[in-house]
Amino acid sequence: MKAYTAAGLDEVGRGALFGPVFAGAVILDNQAEDQLIDAGLKDSKKLSALKRSNLVPLIKKISHCWAIGQSSAREIDLLGIRNATEKAMIRAVHRLEKQPDVLLIDGCLNLRLWHGEQKTVIKGEDLYPSIAAASVLAKVARDDLIKRMAEKYPQYGLEKHVGYGTALHRAAISKFGKTKLHRKTFLSKIQ
């Protein structure tokens, strides 16, 4: 009898002004779920950056499989954030070593590009460890990329706000202009 597999799926960076949107996909068995919960896994927004970073190696080690997908700022501008987010999620799912029978998606974004079973779950990170794990992987991967970009674009203070529309970031955009990694469609009211 074939084992039924579900992949948790979540996105990070959807509302940022800078950089790509990331998505994580994770398949966990019951034992891995319990182990991650015992290690403190929960909604990535409720974890410190250090705790998230400490969970990443464990998630990668004990998950059945995991993957990250992303869509660039250019894709976001060309496709819109909804379609770009969906592409990032589909990319993550397609990169999984094993294709799941069902997707458990945090939020309410049905994937039009996925022809299999899917379930959207509001506050899914609180209900499904696989979604929480996907969120942690995506958040840490995106934050790491943005911190590297902060070295290239130090005038924007990216290490402080990871690309979100804080007053500091908006002021820097007004002063220095946009980079090729800024989402032009998100900046219409700033410049």
UniProtKB/Swiss-Prot annotation:
Enzyme Commission identifier(s): 3.1.26.4
PROSITE patterns linked to this entry: RNASE_H_2
Cited Gene3D superfamilies: Ribonuclease H-like superfamily/Ribonuclease H (3.30.420.10)
Top EC class, one word: hydrolase
Domain of life: Bacteria
Note on how the cofactor is bound: Manganese or magnesium. Binds 1 divalent metal ion per monomer in the absence of substrate. May bind a second metal ion after substrate binding.
Alphabetic keyword roster: Cytoplasm, Endonuclease, Hydrolase, Manganese, Metal-binding, Nuclease
Localization: Cytoplasm
Cofactors required: Mn(2+); Mg(2+)
Principal subcellular localisation of the protein: cytoplasm
SUPFAM superfamilies to which the protein is assigned, alphabetical: Ribonuclease H-like (SSF53098)
Name of a matching Pfam family: RNase_HII
GO biological process: DNA replication, removal of RNA primer; mismatch repair
Alphabetical list of InterPro entries matching this protein: RNase_HII, RNase_HII/HIII, RNase_HII/HIII_dom, RNaseH-like_sf, RNaseH_sf
Domain RNase H type-2 residues, every copy: 4-191
Family membership noted in the UniProt record: Belongs to the RNase HII family.
PANTHER family given in the database record: RIBONUCLEASE H2 SUBUNIT A (PTHR10954), RIBONUCLEASE HII (PTHR10954:SF18)
Function recorded in the entry: Endonuclease that specifically degrades the RNA of RNA-DNA hybrids.
Stated name of the protein: Ribonuclease HII
